Amino acid sequence: MPRRRVVGQRKILPDPKFHSELLAKFINVIMQDGKKSTAEKIIYKALDVVAEKKSENHLVILEAALDNVRPSVEVKSRRVGGSTYQVPCEVRPVRRNALAMRWLVEAARKRGEKSMALRLAGEMLDASENKGTAVKKREDVHRMAEANKAFAHYRW
């Protein structure tokens, strides 16, 4: 038990346009070098592109994309008696969201479209349809956990 008071998690302010905390978090993941206004422009442009291509609400598509990218299990390295095992562990909900956003942005950055907004929109549309690089990353992580299921009893 810590002797001092445990600091609680800070509440994130919702984004100015859609008043969504999820979108505000996503903007922070996209942001580089503290350029938040640029990150906001990229996100909002990507959501506009998604709205043009699909008739559904773009926030629903973003949520669906993140749902399809969220991992439920991952592997962690655990050293036991001189050898290192990849031990499958369940992922906490906050980390699930963080990983999904990070993987979606990484996959978008590797795409070939002209602007980041178009890349992000393309990756969001792909992920919402259960295809694309970010979904493949989740599948790889799940496959790795499945392959190392034998070491699950080393969990901590």
From Swiss-Prot:
Pfam families: Ribosomal_S7. It comes from the Bacteria. This is Small ribosomal subunit protein uS7. Part of the 30S ribosomal subunit. Contacts proteins S9 and S11. GO terms for molecular function: rRNA binding; structural constituent of ribosome; tRNA binding. GO terms for biological process: translation. Keywords: Ribonucleoprotein, Ribosomal protein, RNA-binding, rRNA-binding, tRNA-binding. Transmembrane segments: none annotated. It comes from Shewanella sp. (strain W3-18-1). Belongs to the universal ribosomal protein uS7 family. One of the primary rRNA binding proteins, it binds directly to 16S rRNA where it nucleates assembly of the head domain of the 30S subunit. Is located at the subunit interface close to the decoding center, probably blocks exit of the E-site tRNA. The keyword RNA-binding applies. One of its GO terms (cellular component) is small ribosomal subunit.
